[in-house]
């Protein structure tokens, strides 16, 4: 939809259940966004919330993080919610760092954990 804000959803493997639960609890607010997600995360969100339309990109390690980074750089993504797992080493860690760097450079709201994501969603539901 033209003019609709876009939110990107990403979750590391150990955080995918948390992302699905987050989406389930905030389905009404998320429905007001254009949603893009990395492949597996997007699948989990769709399973949890069949009513949400989710554009699934590649899996993070296969380039999905970079696809979302490119969308941030071109102004297509307005907000990033990325549930990271700081306790597990990621082979594609440089992609993760590049993605969070782009969100910072382009000054879009970014949540890296559930507590911050809850605050961002609550703030956006007040619009």
Curated annotation (Swiss-Prot):
GO process terms (BP): methylglyoxal biosynthetic process
Binding site for substrate: 12, 16, 38-41, 59-60, 92
Keywords: Lyase
Annotated GO MF terms: methylglyoxal synthase activity
Uppermost EC category: lyase
E.C. number: 4.2.3.3
Assigned GO CC terms: cytosol
CDD domains referenced in this protein's UniProt entry, alphabetically: MGS (cd01422)
Reaction(s) the record says it catalyses: dihydroxyacetone phosphate = methylglyoxal + phosphate
Active site: 65
Domain MGS-like: 1-127
Protein family membership: Belongs to the methylglyoxal synthase family.
Function of the molecule: Catalyzes the formation of methylglyoxal from dihydroxyacetone phosphate.
Protein name: Methylglyoxal synthase
Organism: Agrobacterium fabrum (strain C58 / ATCC 33970)
């Amino acid at each position: 939809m033209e003019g609709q804000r876009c939110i990107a959803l990403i979750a590391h493997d150990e955080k995918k259940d948390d992302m699905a639960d987050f989406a389930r609890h905030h389905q009404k607010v998320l429905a007001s966004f254009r949603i893009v997600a990395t492949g597996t995360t997007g699948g989990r969100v769709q399973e949890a919330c069949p009513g949400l339309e989710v554009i699934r990109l590649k899996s993070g390690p296969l380039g999905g993080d970079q696809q979302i980074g490119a969308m941030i750089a071109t102004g297509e993504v307005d907000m990033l919610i990325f549930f990271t797992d700081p306790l597990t080493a990621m082979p594609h860690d440089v992609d993760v760092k590049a993605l969070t760097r782009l969100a910072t450079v382009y000054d879009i709201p970014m949540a890296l954990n559930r507590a911050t994501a809850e605050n961002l969603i609550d703030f956006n539901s007040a619009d």
